[in-house]
């Protein structure tokens, strides 16, 4: 995204005293917020809240999370899911025959390097758009590109991540038979990912209900002063400055208690083909899967 790229080109900030750099970060967050609100206001004013994209952007502005129902048809989603599962067949199973957490395994697909993360019965295969033209087309339609332009001020293409989590019912050599019965979760702790407004999309390849682990979001949490401290700390740490107290990426227990009282915690259940949009300043986490399987495709920007 545009602001992220600008920040990455400002290493000189690391050479400044912390007392000088901190106010700069406060101003960056302030102006990002101001122009983000302005962009959404103009789009909604022109196209209205009855427009699917307009409604989604309006919901994002208010709560930090939105769902566009039936963004993809059942046939389209089934094709995507089939292709995702097909990629599991190409994994180096001998390297996956372990009970240990695999954080960042390099795997080759058609000469391209992809990354794999596995924890228990959950796998993330990262970089599917590098594999073939089928995946490269995903997330490049007009509606998705328009949302990306409004939110990020650029035409960047999504980084695709396939995530499968199951209770043992999904039989495949990519999952060792010796796993414990507990279902561990990748990204299972409440956290915020960004200090400036940035989107992540979740495409539901199957229905995601209470039993198979929906993403949990704290509505309006990004607008709370307690969480804004986390946003500032993320920027401080990005430029190698000491963070203020209260946490940065992860939300500590004290703030969680605060959120339970002040924010509306929702389990973002979605149907197959729905597209969930999440502002990464919002506190969220992956809830434990109780039974069944969960297949989702993440779009990272």
Positions of PLM-derived features:
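Histidine-centered catalytic micro-motifs
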Residues: 187-195, 283-286
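A short hydrophobic beta-strand segment most commonly corresponding to one strand
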Residues: 201-203, 219, 292-301
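Short conserved catalytic/interaction loops centered on acidic-Pro-aromatic/His motifs
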Residues: 215, 286-295
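Compositionally biased, charge-rich terminal segments
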Residues: 1-25
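Double-stranded beta-helix
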Residues: 211-282
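Short, structured patches in soluble enzyme cores that scaffold and shape functional sites
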Residues: 175, 192-194, 203-207, 219
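Non-heme Fe(II)-dependent double-stranded beta-helix
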Residues: 17-62, 69-188
């Amino acid at each position: 995204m545009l602001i992220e790229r600008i920040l990455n080109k400002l290493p000189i900030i690391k050479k400044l005293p912390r007392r000088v750099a901190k106010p700069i970060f406060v101003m960056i967050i302030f102006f990002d917020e101001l122009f983000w609100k302005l962009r959404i206001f103009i789009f909604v004013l022109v196209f209205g809240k009855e427009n699917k994209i307009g409604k989604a952007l309006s919901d994002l502005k208010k709560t930090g999370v939105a769902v566009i129902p039936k963004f993809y048809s059942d046939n389209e989603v089934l094709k995507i899911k089939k292709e995702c599962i097909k990629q599991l067949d190409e994994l180096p199973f001998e390297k996956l025959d372990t009970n240990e957490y695999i954080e960042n395994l390099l795997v080759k697909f058609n000469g391209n390097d992809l990354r794999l993360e596995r924890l228990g019965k959950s796998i993330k295969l990262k970089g599917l758009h590098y594999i073939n033209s089928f995946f490269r087309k995903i997330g490049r339609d007009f509606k998705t590109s328009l949302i990306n332009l409004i939110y990020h001020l650029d035409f960047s293409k999504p980084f695709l991540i396939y995530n499968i989590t199951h209770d043992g019912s999904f039989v495949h050599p990519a999952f060792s038979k010796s796993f414990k019965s507990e279902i561990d979760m990748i990204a299972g702790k409440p956290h915020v990912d960004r200090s400036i407004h940035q989107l992540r999309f979740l495409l539901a390849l199957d229905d995601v209900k209470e039993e198979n682990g929906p993403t949990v979001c704290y509505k309006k949490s990004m607008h709370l002063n307690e969480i804004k401290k986390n946003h500032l700390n993320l920027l401080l740490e990005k430029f190698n400055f000491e963070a203020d107290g209260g946490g940065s990426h992860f939300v500590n227990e004290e703030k969680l208690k605060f959120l339970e009282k002040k924010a509306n915690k929702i389990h973002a259940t979605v149907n197959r083909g729905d597209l969930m949009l999440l502002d990464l300043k919002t506190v969220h986490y992956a809830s434990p899967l109780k039974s069944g399987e969960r297949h989702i495709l993440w779009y990272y920007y």
